[in-house]
Regions:
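Short, polar/charged alpha-helical segment
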Residues: 10, 38-51
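Hydrophobic, well-ordered secondary-structure elements that form the walls
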Residues: 28, 48, 69, 99, ...
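Periplasmic binding protein-like
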Residues: 47-102, 137-138
């Protein structure tokens, strides 16, 4: 999959023109109160503008993003076009658990992507028991997701973990777990 997600503003501009984009502003919701998300929207806005979009970045707290993202109204009536969020590794470990790969139309998450082929691939992955075949299906899911863009992964980060020397038994996991912990003297 090397090279599939390489940034190319000139090519993006050409594709946008070819698609018939008319310059209608794209409403990008910008969460301002969660540190992990705060800087993402301004970067996305810059990249989208380099691609040729007119972007209306609207800043709000996360609770407002959460409430608004459930609205299906058009952007000029209080709706939206894009927002950024983050997931822990356990939520995106495979095509079935990755909620934003759900392309089941009205049953999908916010944005309501609708793609029967992507849904079939996710079902195939869930039913397959051979790890080698699952891997091939997962790669097909990734390629289809790039074609249909139900989500656009923008990166990964490692959340630092620190604790005092007297904390023992902490389990390093994809998400914080607080069992098996004890304090020693």
């Amino acid at each position: 999959m090397d090279g599939l997600l390489t940034s190319n503003a000139k090519k993006a501009q050409e594709l946008l023109k070819e698609a018939g984009y008319d310059g209608t502003p794209v409403v990008l919701m910008h969460s301002t109160d969660l540190k992990v998300l705060t800087n993402l929207a301004p970067v996305a806005k810059s990249l989208m503008e380099k691609a040729g979009f007119k972007v209306d970045m609207q800043s709000m707290d996360w609770q407002s993003v959460v409430a608004r993202r459930a609205k299906k109204d058009p952007p000029n009536a209080g709706g939206w076009n894009a927002f950024l969020t983050a997931w822990v590794a356990a939520d995106v470990m495979n095509p079935v658990s990755t909620a934003y790969l759900n392309a089941a139309c009205e049953k999908a998450l916010f944005g309501w992507p609708c793609d029967a082929q992507l849904e079939k691939l996710r079902d195939d992955f869930a039913r397959e028991v051979d790890p080698a075949k699952q891997k091939a299906i997962a790669e097909a899911v990734q390629l289809r997701a790039i074609e249909t863009t139900p989500e656009i992964p923008v990166g990964e980060y490692v959340q630092p973990v620190a604790m005092r020397k007297n904390v023992k038994g902490f389990v390093i996991a994809p998400a914080p777990v607080f069992w098996n912990i004890e304090l020693t003297k």
